[in-house]
Amino acid sequence: PDVKSGSCLIAGFQPLTVVHPSYWNAYKTESGATFSIDMVRLKLSFINGKGEWLSTHAQTFDCDSMSAWTSKIRPGGWYELWSFDLGDSSVALGIGFMEPSCKVNMNRGFIEFNPNKVAGDKRFWRLLEKLAPCVSHARLKRFDLAYDLPTSRLDCRLSKDRRMYKSVISNGITEYLGVKNTPGYVKVYDKAAEMHLSGMLTR
């Protein structure tokens, strides 16, 4: 088998050799801060019959490994969920939206991915090339904006307002403002500690 060198865990220790997270099409300010898109979710409308085609051909997509789940009929859920592992991240694909009538609409779907982690992988673009002919319309449903500061987490604080606030002390201090999965939700945490970076970085 092919053996490739790279960052690895040995006896539970992570070497501090990474100096920054991966970015794709990021914007860097003069102060050294970095803006990037850390998650994208697209709502998909499939051409008639193409949802069924994807259901039977998704297993041919090139990736490290894949997982697939078929859900019970539950209004508002997804009939099929696919996960394609690409390196240290993955791409999620949903096929078949469950309507309030409990009918499965195979012409609806979604795709979710982190461009910072998968856009540098050629297999991701090949996956999109296979998906594109099946889609009649794609609409941006959600994106997460990452703002990275080359500063210690101890020097940063989240300004509270009337939204729900929570603070967690575990592997550094993590603060939350707002309701998860809703517009304006904010999370401030020690990115350096999370990724075992050699320098200081707060996201």
Features from the language model and the residues they span:
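Structured, helix-rich domain cores that form ligand/interaction pockets
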Residues: 1-202
